[in-house]
């Protein structure tokens, strides 16, 4: 790809506007949800006047018109797949439909952008360490591997030990899972005496959490699995939005398939290949810093500096200092004796109190160093408390690192 330049940006913008204008007529004609909110778009000024859309808007629509809402451009019998959001934020999950064309788009974006950016080829064997539930992320990874021509290997209905042994037995070279689950595989591999770094794995693609863009977490995974990590971003209702490149200093957003904006530090996205249930100017809730500059990987696409480091609703406050779980994780993962952690945030007499709960390896207590490192790096005093092994939850999908406790 050519390097980022004015000419490449002009080309990207022209292609985006062309695809938007090609897709909108059918939406305006038959999609009840968008017909009330949109008008025809002739140029970028028209586009920027369109209203922002929120997840609350989508949830309200599905509650008013169950089970799938009114964001449907085609008759119901045109749709071939249904998935739903993880519901990890505590909210009711969204259900999302795809027609055959939209699902083909998902697979193609994974194959052409996510896998190729992670240097995955048709010769690879891709192991997908997840259960085949309604969450779309790894279904699309499986379909993308097929689209690429790689061997797609399901890790469904397996224990972590079985997955580790299967990876070695079948010669898997690529792993797809959450960052938290990758660290769980490292932990279990050590417990059962398997040399996981000695397996054929060479690449790991992570999604669902910011971990693969957090330097200390990425380093722990790479050392523990013997792989090179790549971060992937996406949303069930939106699509596969980005992937880190060989430089791994951020995530390139896939501008050939989406329109991206940064509004008050939040990522706003419009998909351009999912017209059966499109999203236009959608507030993702992800806090970002976008930067457009030449990248040595050759991508012309805008970069999220440091990756998606957190969601706006994940912010918590310690004595007036605003923090995100990813900032705490970056410090915690520098201490290899910490096996798992959880942040507890509570209000006591109108004051914020934060406690970091940690599980550690036998006989090693890093609490004093942790307290000191957290205070020095974040400018906040955070209580640290060790808990017995096995106390904190292990997650296969998105890990919840922040536990909010009601006012006392």
Regions found by a protein language model. Give the residues of each.
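Active-site glycine/GP-rich loop and adjacent strand/helix microenvironment
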Residues: 1-26, 148-408
């Amino acid at each position: 790809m050519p390097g980022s330049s004015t000419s490449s940006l002009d080309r990207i913008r022209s292609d985006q506007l062309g695809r938007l204008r090609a897709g909108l007529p059918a939406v305006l004609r038959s999609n009840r949800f968008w017909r009330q909110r949109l008008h025809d778009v002739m140029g970028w000024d028209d586009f920027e006047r369109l209203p922002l859309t929120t997840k609350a808007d989508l949830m309200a629509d599905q509650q008013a018109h169950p089970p799938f809402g009114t964001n449907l451009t085609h008759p119901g019998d045109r749709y071939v797949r249904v998935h739903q959001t993880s519901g990890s934020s505590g909210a009711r999950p969204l259900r999302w439909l795809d027609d055959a064309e939209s699902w083909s788009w998902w697979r193609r974006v994974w194959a052409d952008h996510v896998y190729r950016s992670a240097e995955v080829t048709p010769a690879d064997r891709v192991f997908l360490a997840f259960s085949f539930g309604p969450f779309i992320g790894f279904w699309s990874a499986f379909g993308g591997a097929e689209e690429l021509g790689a061997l797609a290997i399901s890790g469904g209905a397996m224990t972590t030990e079985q997955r580790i042994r299967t990876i070695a037995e079948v010669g898997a070279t690529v792993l797809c899972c959450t960052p938290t689950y990758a660290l769980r595989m490292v932990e279990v591999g050590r417990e059962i005496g398997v040399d996981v770094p000695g397996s054929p794995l060479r690449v790991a693609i992570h999604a669902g959490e910011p971990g693969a863009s957090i330097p200390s977490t990425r380093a722990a995974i790479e050392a523990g699995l013997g792989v090179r990590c790549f971060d992937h971003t996406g949303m069930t209702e939106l699509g596969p939005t980005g992937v880190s490149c060989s430089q791994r200093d951020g995530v390139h957003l896939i501008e050939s398939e989406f329109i991206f904006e940064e509004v008050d530090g939040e990522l706003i996205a419009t998909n351009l290949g999912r017209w059966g249930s499109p999203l236009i100017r959608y507030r993702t809730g992800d806090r970002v810093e976008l930067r457009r500059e030449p990248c040595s990987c050759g991508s012309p696409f805008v970069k999220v500096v440091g990756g998606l480091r957190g969601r706006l609703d994940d912010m918590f406050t310690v004595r007036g200092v605003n923090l995100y779980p990813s900032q705490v994780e970056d410090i915690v993962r520098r201490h290899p004796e910490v096996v798992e952690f959880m942040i507890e945030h509570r209000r006591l007499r109108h004051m914020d109190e934060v406690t970091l709960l940690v599980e550690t390896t036998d006989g090693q207590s890093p609490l004093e160093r942790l307290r000191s490192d957290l205070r020095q790096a974040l400018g906040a005093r955070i209580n640290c408390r060790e808990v017995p092994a096995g106390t904190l939850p292990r997650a296969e999908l998105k890990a919840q690192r922040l536990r909010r406790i009601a006012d006392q």
